Amino acid sequence: YKFKYYLSVYYPRPDTTNFGDVDGDGVSEDCSKFEDCRKIIKWYLDLALEYNKNAAFKNIELAGFYWFDEAIDSSENSYKLINNIADQTKERGYDLFWIPYYCAPGVSEWAEYGFATACMQPNYVFNLTTPLSNIKNAADIIKRLGMCIEIEISGDALSKDAYYRRYLEYLKGGIYYGYMKDCIHMYYQDTLAYN
């Protein structure tokens, strides 16, 4: 058995105008230019895949790439860039997936951006004032949009009953609203959990 892992792909921020030279032409890439962003992503993917190949991991396997930003602005540049990243990952035999926050900008267009999979976060577990209805609403949205779900656990769930009960609501919601079957699950474990 090999544990499958995904590498994050970060958004080349347009305000980064001196990224560095990634293609050996002696000119630093400018992230405010689409063509330079395309070069940066190509360089990053090639570097990641080369490292992965040379490492010859025995027990882990690169399964794909993860778009790190949890929301997408509606600009034409974002649309072009994310589609280009999805195309570049597909050309290399990998998928690109996304985990947006609850009802984030871009959620309803996730497939148009080229993501193979998108798993929405209900964002219920971390804030005690977030209503339980987020769980059902998230389940309804992911069904309607053909998405998947992220199940989250707070580090406080191990020491504070209120956070533990919130985590259990995710699990119960999966039974009540059907996302425990026939749906991909992503899991977010707060970095403070299990320390």
Give the ranges of each region predicted by the language model.
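Glutamate identity and glutamate-enriched acidic tracts
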Residues: 29, 35, 50, 61, ...
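Structural preference for beta-strand elements that scaffold enzyme active sites
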Residues: 2-8, 60-66, 93-97, 117-119, ...
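Substrate-binding cleft of secreted/luminal carbohydrate-active enzymes
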Residues: 103-105, 117-195
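A structural motif corresponding to the C-terminal end of an alpha-helix
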Residues: 1-3, 48-61, 85-94, 141-147, ...
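Well-ordered, non-membrane alpha-helical segments in soluble/globular domains
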Residues: 27-51, 77-87, 129-138, 160-174, ...
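Extracellular glycoside hydrolase catalytic/binding regions
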Residues: 41-44, 68, 72, 78-81, ...
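Short catalytic/ligand-binding loop motif for oxyanion handling, primarily in non-cytosolic enzymes
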Residues: 14-17, 73-75, 105-107, 158-160
